[in-house]
């Protein structure tokens, strides 16, 4: 028996029966006391001595404590049956130690329980070689790890001091959680995480690259289409489209020449081109007739020196010319006197060679002289001139009719100017008298 006397006189004396308490505890937990080490017992006893008011029950009458202990024994007796299957597995795995130690220390103090459990865990984890439990539960990768990783996990436990000066070990939750799960592989390094992020970025960038390539190809196609449209617009605006029709006809003729055609088609096309060329030439003749002289077949030729005017000579025209000449005091017969005269033939109207041709003759001449039907419009005028020259040559080769003097009184030999004047005056007087009689 130990008696403690407090300093204050007001508090009564209290007696603590350590022996009975110890005996009662020892009777309850005989099986569990064998597993406790001597160091743990020493820690428990020191804690009991340091904090008696918290750990031990204070009582004035020791009989009440005995009755309470007996009740506890009666209540906890059915809790100790025979060891079952799960209990045996826990016993062989080493879990019974931690459970029984915690149950014993729960009666004393939670702080003591924490320190004891932490000391056991640190003693187990301080060893470099893993136990059977760890080898069976951890993954295959944890067996191949080095001792440095284990030491790094053990270094995660940090020691802190309480206000009372006690040493308390506090673990880092994140690292302890990874250590319990056995994720001590090379994936947990920061570099490996960065590498995985890079690979994930690459994987995520691959579809973007494919999308970019698809977009770039689509953009190239659209650009090509735009370039083609611009070229078409430039061709439409160029001279090739809005140029002269002659160049277009030339190109079409060249293309038609290059394309080979069967003989029956070529013949029909030649006939068509000839007919088109002849029609175009006849149209040109009509246009020239409208724009130029109204009667081109009555025009004066270069080989006809006797026709002073553009009309055919007749009696009425001769008389009218004499009247006008007398009125203007001009002798028209001076020109006629120079022409050769034959007395044998009577007065005749000189025959004028007709250069005008019929429509089929003109078509033949134009088709023979033209060559290609496409260029007939350019050579139509020249072809007419050529035909006129041929007619002139033919008329020159033939015997030209002798021109008869209009007035038989004239002689072949030229006379002096005075005699010519007299003859002209006399002829004018005769014509005037004849006109008066006719009226």
From Swiss-Prot:
Phosphorylated on Ser and to a lower extent on Thr by phytochromes. Phosphorylation is stimulated twofold by red light. Residues 63-79, 412-421 have a biased composition (Basic and acidic residues). Expressed in young seedlings in both darkness and light. Moderate in leaves and very low in roots and flowers. Expressed in the elongation zone of the root and hypocotyl. Residues 424-439 have a biased composition (Low complexity). One of its GO terms (cellular component) is cytoplasm. It is found in: Cell membrane. Residues 1-22, 54-80, 100-139, 259-311, 355-439 are annotated as: Disordered. The modification Phosphoserine is found at residues 238, 244. InterPro entries: PKS. GO terms for biological process: phototropism; positive gravitropism; red or far-red light signaling pathway; red, far-red light phototransduction; response to far red light; response to red light. Residues 1-14, 100-109, 118-139 have a biased composition (Polar residues). It is a peripheral membrane protein. Induction: Up-regulated by white, red, far-red and blue light. The keyword Membrane applies. It comes from the Eukaryota. Disruption phenotype: Increased hypocotyl growth inhibition and cotyledon unfolding responses in the very low fluence response (VLFR) mode. Reduced phototropic response. Reduced hyponasty when grown under blue light. Loss of negative root phototropism. Auxin accumulation in protoplasts. The keyword Endoplasmic reticulum does not apply. Disulfide bonds: none annotated. Keywords: Cell membrane, Membrane, Phosphoprotein, Phytochrome signaling pathway. May be responsible for light-regulated cytoplasmic sequestration of phytochromes or may be a negative regulator of phytochrome B signaling. Component of the network that modulates the very low-fluence response (VLFR) branch of phyA signaling. Acts positively in PHOT1 signaling. Regulates phytochrome-mediated photomorphogenesis and hypocotyl phototropism. Involved in the control of leaf flattening and leaf positioning. Promotes negative root phototropism and negatively regulates root gravitropism. May act by controlling auxin homeostasis. PANTHER family: PROTEIN PHYTOCHROME KINASE SUBSTRATE 1, PROTEIN PHYTOCHROME KINASE SUBSTRATE 1-RELATED. Interacts with PKS2, RPT3, PHOT1, PHOT2 and the C-termini of both phytochromes A (phyA) and B (phyB). Binds both spectral forms of phytochrome, Pr and Pfr. Belongs to the PKS family. PKS1, PKS2 and/or PKS4 are essential for phototropism but not for inhibition of gravitropism under long-term blue light irradiation. This is Protein PHYTOCHROME KINASE SUBSTRATE 1. It comes from Arabidopsis thaliana. The gene is PKS1.
């Amino acid at each position: 028996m130990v008696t403690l006397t407090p300093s204050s006189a007001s508090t009564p004396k209290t007696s603590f029966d350590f022996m009975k308490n110890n005996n009662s505890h020892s009777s309850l937990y005989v099986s569990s006391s064998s597993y406790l080490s001597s160091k743990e017992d020493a820690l428990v006893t020191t804690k009991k001595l340091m904090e008696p008011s918290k750990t031990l029950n204070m009582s004035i009458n020791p009989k009440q404590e005995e009755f309470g202990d007996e009740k506890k024994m009666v209540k906890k007796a059915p809790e100790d049956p025979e060891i079952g299957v799960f209990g045996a597995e826990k016993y062989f795995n080493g879990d019974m130690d931690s459970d029984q130690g915690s149950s014993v220390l729960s009666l004393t103090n939670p702080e003591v329980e924490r320190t004891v459990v932490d000391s056991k865990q640190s003693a187990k984890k301080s060893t470099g070689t893993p136990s059977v439990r760890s080898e069976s539960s951890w993954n295959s990768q944890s067996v191949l790890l080095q001792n440095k990783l284990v030491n790094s996990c053990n270094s995660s436990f940090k020691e802190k001091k309480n206000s009372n000066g006690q040493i308390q070990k506090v673990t880092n939750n994140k690292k302890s959680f990874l250590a319990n799960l056995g994720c001590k592989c090379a994936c947990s390094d920061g570099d490996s995480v960065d590498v995985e992020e890079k690979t994930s970025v690459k994987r995520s960038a691959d579809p973007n690259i494919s999308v970019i390539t698809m977009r770039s190809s689509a953009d190239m196609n659209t650009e090509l289409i735009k370039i083609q449209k611009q070229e078409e617009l430039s061709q439409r605006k160029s001279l090739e489209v809005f140029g002269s029709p002659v160049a277009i006809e030339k190109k079409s003729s060249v293309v038609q020449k290059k394309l080979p055609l069967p003989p029956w088609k070529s013949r029909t096309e030649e006939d068509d081109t000839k007919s088109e060329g002849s029609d175009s030439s006849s149209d040109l003749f009509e246009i020239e007739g409208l724009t130029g002289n109204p009667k081109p077949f009555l025009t004066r030729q270069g080989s006809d020196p006797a026709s002073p005017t553009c009309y055919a000579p007749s009696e009425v025209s001769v008389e009218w010319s004499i009247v006008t000449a007398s009125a203007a005091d001009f002798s028209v017969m001076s020109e006629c006197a120079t022409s050769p005269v034959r007395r044998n033939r009577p007065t005749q109207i000189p025959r004028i060679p007709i250069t005008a041709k019929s429509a089929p003759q003109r078509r033949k001449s134009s088709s023979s002289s033209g060559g290609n039907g496409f260029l007939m419009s350019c050579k139509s005028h020249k072809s007419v001139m050529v035909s006129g020259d041929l007619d002139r040559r033919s008329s020159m080769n033939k015997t030209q009719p002798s021109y008869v003097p209009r007035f038989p009184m004239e002689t072949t030999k030229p006379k002096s100017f005075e005699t010519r004047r007299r003859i002209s005056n006399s002829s004018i007087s005769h014509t005037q008298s004849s006109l008066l009689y006719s009226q």
